[in-house]
Structures are given as C-alpha cells and as structure tokens.
Amino acid sequence: MSAEEADKTTTTDASAGDEEEEWLYGDEGESKETEEEEAKLTAAISATSTTPVAEDAPTTTNNSSDSATPPTTTTTTGNGVASQEEAPGEDEDSESDSDDDDDDVRVTIGDIKTGAPQYTGYGGTPVNLNIKSAGSRAYGAGAKVKGVDLEAPGSINGVPVLEADMESFEEKPWRKPGADLSDYFNYGFNEDTWKAYCEKQKRLRMGLDVLNIGSTTSKISVQQGRTGNNEKEITIPAHASKAEFTSPSNLYKAGLNQGRISPPHWAGPPSQDLSYYTKTPGTIDVIGGQTATISRVEGRRRHNLEGNNIQVISEHSSSEVEPEVQKMPPPFFPPGPLPPNIPPPPFLPPPVSQAPPLIPPHRMPITVPPPNFPPPTGGPPPSLIPTLDNSGHPGGYDGRPVAPYPFPTGGFPPPMQGAVNPWPGLMENPKQWDYYPRRDKEREKERERERQRDRGHERDHSPNAGPYNSMAMCSDEERYRSYRDYGDRGYERHRERASREKEERHGGRRHREKEEGRHKSSRSSSRRRHESEEGDSHRRHKHKKSKRSKEGKEPSEERSADQENQEAME
C-alpha cells in the first residue's frame, strides 16, 4: 500500500467517524454550550460533596493497556453520554482501540450521594457525571417526603380550625362591604353560625351534650341543597354514628292501637298519629323519606331537654295527616227495614205497573210533602208498602229476593230498629222548598206568554194555580189522581199545540200554493193574450194575401177570356 492510499483511507475513516459522532452526539459548538450550562448547574451540587468533580475542563483518561496510545479527551454532552475526541495525527491503530476506551468511562445518571462508592475500571481514574434537569432540587440525606393528609382536620397557623378564635384575627376581610362570604365560609356559614357550629362540635367531642346547643340565637337547618339563606346548611354523612342519635321507643309508643281507628271509637279529642315515629331505636326518623337513606330533611332541630332524639318536620306532619282523616266523608249507611206502622218516605217509588206518569203538578215538588202540612194520616195504598220477608229485609220485585247488604264489623251502627223520628221534624227548613215553586212559576209564565202570543183567547185551565194551602190532599189516591189529571191536561195542551202548529203549516202551504196559482194564472193569461194577438195578426196577414191573390186572379181570367175570344174570331 502506498503512502497516498494510506492517507486517503485515514481521512475517509476520520471523516466517517466524525459524521457518526455528529449524528449521535451533536455538533462541537452545541457540546460546548451544553457543557457550560452543565457546569453552572452542577457547581452548587458539587460544592456539597467532599470530593468535588471539576467539570470545567475536559477530563483526561489514560489507557493502562497501551501506554503508547495518544491520550483521548472525554467530554460530556447534553444527553449525558461521554464523547471522545481523537488527537490530530491519529492512525488506524488508535481508531481501532476506541471501543476499549469507552469501557474506562463510568456515566452515572441520577443523584450522587456523599460517600458514594468510586468505581475504578482498568486502573483508570473514574469519572462521575451528575446530570439533572433544571427544575429539580436536591433532597437532603435524611429528607422525608411530606404530602397532604386529607383525613387530618384543617388548621390555621398550626391551630385546628374548630379551635381557632376568629376574634383573635387582626384582619376580618369577610366583614368588609362587598365581600363574598363564600370566599371565607363554606356550606353557607357566616360568622355567627360558624361560632355556633364550633361550639356544638366542641361539646360533642367532650361528651357533655349530644344535641343541646348553648346559644339560643343559632338556627341550624339541615337541607339537601343550597337555598341561599344565611342559616347553616349541612349534610348528614351516611357513615355517621347512629349511637349518638338514639331515639327511645318508649317516648313515642303511647299505647296506640295499630289497627284502623274508626270514628265511633274516639272517646275524646283525636290523638296524633305517631306511626312515623314508631321505628326501631338507633335510627334517624325522617318524614317523607325511607328508613335506609336520608333523602331530604327540612326544618329546624328542636332544643329538646328531655331526650336526645331528632324531630324533623317535612312535607307531611302529624298535624296535617289528622285533618285529612277528619275531612273524609262519613261512610254511607244503607237504610234498614222500615217498621210497618210508619208511612214510607215520599221518595220510595211505587211499583212500576201501578205508578202514574211522573209529571209533577204545578208548584208541587214530587219528592217531599209541603212544609206546613203533616204527613197523611191514613196509610198509603197496600201497593206502596214493600213486603217484608222473615229476615226483616224488604222483598224484591217480581218475587226476586234482595241480597242482604253486608255490614262491615266495627265502625258502622246497626240497622235502625224501633221508632223513627216523624217526617215533619226533618223538614223544618222552608228554604229548600222555595226553589221548586219559583222555578215552576217562571216556566208557567213563559208558557203563558207563548200562549198569548200564539192565541189570545187561550187561557190556562189548570186548577192548581192557587197557593199551597188551596190544595187539601187527604190521601195519596187524590194526589195520584191529580197527577193523572194534570198529565191528561198536559197531553191535551200538547196535542192542541201540535194541531195548531200543523194548521199553521198547512195554512202557510195553502197560502204559498194560492200565490203560486195566482202567478201561474197570470202567466197563462198573458201567454194566451200574446198568442191571440199573434193569431190575429197572422190571420190578418193571410187575409191580405188572399185578397191580393183574388185580385190577381180576376184580371188574369179577364185576359184569358179576351184571348179566347180573339182566337175564335180568327
């Protein structure tokens, strides 16, 4: 191999190695800049160590295996890997030994602690490189990582929040005008309610009082959502100890019957329905929710000195439940059998086969007798009294028995037996009788006006036009007879009115037919007149033509006769 070829190969190998180093480790200018930055960053850290490592100058390592090899310079780059720069005039042998030189450099990435073991490789001087990011800080040898304890109670300057006295603060920014309380107090607290809450928590921790709060000005309401009021709003945690809120069962179980309380069983004023409070001890009773979870709690806690129970008032309280029970309509009591010595009530219907048409008389309601008259002295007709079977119940129509009404046990009185109050005693209010005569009177006045408008000579033939005292009915038969007569008269009036309307319709039809006939006759007469005039003119025209034809025929005949005479003469 000639010297020129050796120089060419040496230059090509060196250039190839430089390209690889630049591709792997960057340019020399960049390495110098990063070297200066690393020197500034590690100056403070290396000052704490006993044997500081100077990184300002490049570290020189000697290869112990080959003393004739020229020294290589190792520099630290930005990525923490040592790069070697070969001395000028290096040949192929030194290029081949670059792999052995890498084994002498020990690169440590991370923290360098004081008294760390020094690694010696192949008898060379070890190199410790401390490479760290700019934002990190070095921890001490005995430093303990301190985090945020979420379970620990909050503190203000080392004093627990519940024990801190707000009066001792020099500045009270929440008192300034325009300050938002939510920036200083959570859960809707203000200064007064926070003091009351701290006092309550203090007493609860000391075990002096469970729910009694010393200050009477504090109003603590327990609600689920934020309502914007200044009262305290807290939520009861699900894992709260229920032993502190025990509600003794003997406080509420006042010997109530758990069955249904019917109105006849009430001996005095109705007692409150405390079924909401008869729960097992150790639970918090919430009206309107379930026993397993607290869905919504409204109201204020009562300052109860007798027991440690929680009384919560919600949508349905016991005072609101009772009026609902009292407002229920009384149950329907079916009437019992009537005694045979008392006339039936007026609204009892007669048998269908014998009942007259139900048309009420003038100014007389059909349901009840007049207010100033006693009931009829004589009994009603036998057909109006319902037959009683052996069981005491009224028999049914057409021989069919009536099923007995099943009275429920308790809460209903037995069927009425014995004497019954007389009917006039039940009908002392005359106001309810005034409505029906007034309505009938208005109807009759309207009918009278219609009759007078239709036919002036028609009058009302009803004998019941007088007041009530003009009708003296001695029995039900006379009443039914008057009903029948009134129905017959009403039917006659209806028939007369229908016949009158029919006559009016027929009269109007005849009038229309007469008018139409008059128009037809006038049209036919005008048509006949027109035809006669046309016929006359036509006849005159024909007469003129015939006269002309006759006149024309006469001279023609004369001429023909003259011609014949001339021919004969010839």
Swiss-Prot record:
- Pfam families from the UniProt entry: Fip1
| Protein name, per record | Pre-mRNA 3'-end-processing factor FIP1
Phosphoserine modification sites?
247
User: Where is this gene product found?
Assistant: Nucleus
Q: Where is the composition biased (Low complexity)?
A: 56-77
Xref: InterPro entries: Fip1_dom, Pre-mRNA_3'-end_processing_reg
Biased composition range(s): Pro residues: 371-384
Explain the purpose of this protein.
Involved in mRNA processing.
Q: Does the keyword Phosphoprotein apply?
A: yes
Q: What GO biological process terms does the UniProt entry carry, in alphabetical order? A: mRNA processing
Q: What species is this protein from?
A: Danio rerio (Zebrafish)
Q: What spans are recorded as compositionally biased (Basic and acidic residues)?
A: 1-10, 436-462, 476-506, 549-562
